[in-house]
Amino acid sequence: MDAIQAIKERRSINFFETGKDIPNDKLKEMLEIANLSPSSFNLQPWKVVVVKDPERKKILKQCAFNQPKVEEASAVLIMVADPGAMEENIDRMLDSWQELGYMKPEMRETYEGMTNNLYSEPNSLKRKIFAVKNTSLFAMNLMIAAKGLGLETHPMDGFDEECVKKEFNIPEDKIIPMLIAVGYLRQGITLLPRAFRRSIDEFVKFEKY
């Protein structure tokens, strides 16, 4: 399946085949593909908690207002946006740029200063927005990769973030933009036609808003 077909055929699935496992090798392949996502200064501020154990999914379901798909999906991925990724990853990023010829050694301090000026302190709003924006790019690529690998997904915004952090040992300074249920469409389910989409004429402007 090519990328355009995967995008066109991806749907947010509410009815997953229960009890059907996704091999860890396939999950890892999906995550490796998603990890090719672009990110600001290549800082990659995403982390993922994979929840497959039935008992752990029950707990996550409670944090997600008892939505059945959390328990029925083969796995649920907790998307974690890390505002502290700049400090964690900047040295490796700059080393890579220098080794591969993207940056001359004398420009290192300049790039360090640029990232500090652009993203401010770790607990700032700018830094939180940076983390969520880039983690969302990763999440979208993950869903396209999943479709290409024969899996179905559903991104979820309906959950108690503090509950998820507490139950899954996620540090308080991290942000959870979404959960993504991953699995297989339940046998016998026929999806309804894709819901309303606006015409691009309604939301696309050229040259100015």
Where in the sequence are the language-model features?
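Acidic, surface-exposed loops and disordered segments
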Residues: 1-209
